């Protein structure tokens, strides 16, 4: 029985020495076992290395195992485990249960127990206790010796948890963390190990459990060989980096001494050329000097070491992919000879996956996969969340879109569109016998068409099919209220919807399509779920819980579970984390993300027990895991072992920015390598160089090369430089390929693509809009704002997905309807506006609003308390509106003669007809809220009032550009169509906007009711354009003194007009003429097919800000031909001068005097 150390720095050949020693023992003969113990992640590669050397001879004599697998072998021989292991998921669920049970007894963990992730922190701490052989008895004894009150309280709580965990666990299970502790005692009984020779390789340190096993092996076996990555004499220039293994050596020597184990002369592999670096002196030099002080300088320019700086993570991985293709293609390297590692696999995993697939590089990402994103797990979470979250939209459709429900994808779309439009959410609405909500009119419309009824029938059929298994599950759960019963109900539900058969079908489909990793994942997932629930039932099956509590416990376990993945082939690039880098024959090593805080990683969090806590416990003889300072030293050692892992080539790369554009700094390792190799040239893609040589480097796999070709041609077209002739050769290759010919044709279409559409043919325009153009005035205004937006909305009839909500147009429509009904009511009841008071306003408005809501079965305004409040708010606004309207009538002589006046065939007035220059006509329709009239001195004055739910501001400048032409067109139509006696004169009185609102008045607290009323009227003053006749203006507000509080006008003391928004009769005439010219011009453009993306921009105002079609047009001033139609805000004076000049020039053209 002896102990022998095998010393050697990284790459010295320690693993190879072990394998050759085993082979020597085999050749000498004998039957004693030869056992190589390695960390779990190295076992496969080590076994392969041994097979490569010794073949299949005496293979039964050699065992390559980890400590865990050694435990299982000994248990198989001598017994020791009569119960099943509880996995990490089961333990997390158990800890959660314990934390909830004991929370009233905690001294410090009561609040922390609720924090996300705290259960896992507790689980890790208890696992640490077991690995470091800290029993509950020792923990309790230690508490009495601790003076630090905070630590004493922590240990008190941990002791409670630890005790309860062991008590509950050992009823039916055993903790995998106890295996090595049990193994230590069972080795004594083993005959398999008697006289065996052991080699321990690839360990830098051991935990107490492992030291205990090594101690027993030393007593049992003929020899124990242990490799240590360090110098032989402990006097090297970089002892600091080997402090971890030096401490391991000291502890092993002490252990041998305590057991009277002889120490053999060690093997020193540092004195000969390093095995790994026999073909690479540069890498050998790097290994010797990476952490040496003082250090040497490599005088030549290195060929086997490269540093690359990239713009971002994406271009970094692209560079590596091209480099890998080059090695495989030109240097006869196998993919399995290559490894790509990083200190931050999470940030790179998806990018590597996407780019390597594009470059057709076979790869295996070495990591344990979370199962949370598996479709079956999402299904289970969704079905529970449907009830926990009261049938929310998100949970229901997350369930449906897993693909396990008996609903086809197009049926899910139908159901989803209806649910969004009708605002279906909550158990009550989902479980209604039949849905009858109208989703095809506006949000406040209640009538249902025949077409709507047919669609509703289909929606209800889909809904009922979805509900059947869901409601069955609900009934089962309602009858069961403990963990075991809920688990049983959940399994019954999964069988009801045929999940096992569906999963099996998915596995077969994945295998047939070559997606082996997904096939492996889904072939495991069903058994994982069964195991999870079995453990949950065994541990706390009789616990009474509701669904929410059950879900929380179950998904704590699910989050903890990791699924091991198996490589689908041998010839793959290994992609992984530096701490799992397997020591196999890596010829080419890429270390990516060599950034500060990543390589080496930043300091780890202290956890529940701080560094100070660990120091105190250590002083009491309690050994625990390393503090953060020691962990930092281990990180340095990890960097050393990673960077020296390659046999032939080392590539270090780092991005200067992350995915969000935030600056990243290079690691100190980069600067260290530059210092050791002063002639190394750091390459970069930050500043791209365009020449034939660089272009050649971009030619790799077909897909990325094609993309690079497109990029090069695009740059040439954009005037960013001449394309290399190489890309013309590349194009010729692709164009001759049957697979790529079509793509080449599409490429030039894409390169020359512009989102600008200019014109469609007049023929298409006629088909879209009809031979004689008929449209509403508001639509014409939309066309003037942006032709393309009009084309998409009214030509193509593209509509946004309807969502159950109350939009401003919905509110405006509803308010107009109520105002119209109020006006008709007082007219029918012969109530004069002068008699309308607060009581009448409130009584009738409230009644009309209630009737409108009740008469619309699916009205949004009675769908929830929130919308009921909006309805109440609408009542107040509308009451205030009609009260102000009444006050306006009382103060003036104008009287209403029409409400909701329409301009259309069969309407109050005929449609507005405008002749175009080619002899055709455009027919404009529309509706105005109110027309008022007043007769004075033999003339009739017309006042048009339009109600607005938003704060509409009248600007003459907007009329000039065509953005606000409705009121003038309606006024013109009325003036032309009024049937009055020939001697009477019909004149424009005003065009006005009136805002419907219930404003909040800011002012002093001692305002009288009359003052408040006046302030409200000022706030709701009508805006628009008046006839500049003081007598007519006074008839609109007989009480005005100076400035009016109801119209935009003021009268001076001498009776003349002061500051007012007014125009003469002649100005009204030329303004109307200007508007009619705008109609002609824009309608002709429309019929000519002008659908250009040409939005206007006035200052900061532009229609794109509220346009729902921006994702279609993708307007961007960076694109060629994408320009705003800039319009300048003009003063009223400027507008009048421009219009008068235009009318004068037009008259000159017609030869008028």
UniProtKB/Swiss-Prot annotation:
Disulphide connectivity of cysteines: none
Cofactor requirement: Mg(2+); [4Fe-4S] cluster
Enzyme Commission number(s) from the entry: 3.1.-.-
Binding site for [4Fe-4S] cluster: 786, 1104, 1107, 1113
Note describing how the cofactor binds: Binds 1 [4Fe-4S] cluster.
UniProt binding sites for ATP: 8-15
Pfam families: ADDB_N (PF21445), PDDEXK_1 (PF12705), UvrD_C (PF13361)
Superkingdom assignment: Bacteria
One GO BP: double-strand break repair via homologous recombination
An MF annotation (GO) of this entry: 4 iron, 4 sulfur cluster binding
InterPro entries in alphabetical order: ADDB_N, DNA_helicase_suAddB, DNA_helicase_UvrD-like_C, P-loop_NTPase, PDDEXK-like_dom_sf, PDDEXK_AddAB-type
Keyword line: 4Fe-4S, ATP-binding, DNA damage, DNA repair, DNA-binding, Exonuclease, Helicase, Hydrolase, Iron, Iron-sulfur, Metal-binding, Nuclease, Nucleotide-binding
Enzyme class: hydrolase
Summary of subunit composition and partner proteins: Heterodimer of AddA and AddB.
Function, as annotated: The heterodimer acts as both an ATP-dependent DNA helicase and an ATP-dependent, dual-direction single-stranded exonuclease. Recognizes the chi site generating a DNA molecule suitable for the initiation of homologous recombination. The AddB subunit has 5' -> 3' nuclease activity but not helicase activity.
Family: Belongs to the helicase family. AddB/RexB type 1 subfamily.
The name this protein goes by in its record: ATP-dependent helicase/deoxyribonuclease subunit B
Name of the gene encoding the protein in the UniProt record: addB
